[in-house]
Amino acid sequence: MKYLPLILLLTVTTVQAADTFQQKVKDVFQKKTSVDYTDWYGKGDAAIAEFKGFNLGVYQDLKASVRDNEINIKMQYVTGPVRPDSDDFAQMTSALCETVFEPFVVPDYVRPTSWDDDTPSPLNFMYVDNLKQTEDDPVEKTVNGWKIKIERSVMKTTCSARKVN
């Protein structure tokens, strides 16, 4: 009985450590997208968000799941008042994937602050000018021990980042 407080403390600490990564990802979504904290729910060891509405100025269906050291995002255009060009949609959603992954995959990367600084982000491989560049094939790369994958098709983008070591 005298060890009960210690056991409870260790249990709470373990739960808080597991929630820290998920909470940080939720915070990025809160700042960079229309997905807010109320769109998230727990399912097993994952935090899942489902959002249908305007995001980045486009009506879309966005789904995200976060486990410890793993992020998955799927964005798909849903019929709405504004239909973007497929290439524009691919660019917007690719940029969002890069923005969400960046604080975790390349936390020390500093975005350029002057017009003549052309230091590329290690995640720039995710960006495309048009869908013809991708030919609907997934692009994968390992960056700082994270396996990054992005796949685009007409009006749909899926991306994931998973810590591999």
Name the predicted role of every residue range.
Residues 3-13:
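Sec-dependent N-terminal signal peptides
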Residues 12-13, 34, 145:
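Short, flexible coil/linker elements and helix-boundary hinge sites characteristic
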Residues 103-165:
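Non-cytosolic coordination micro-motifs
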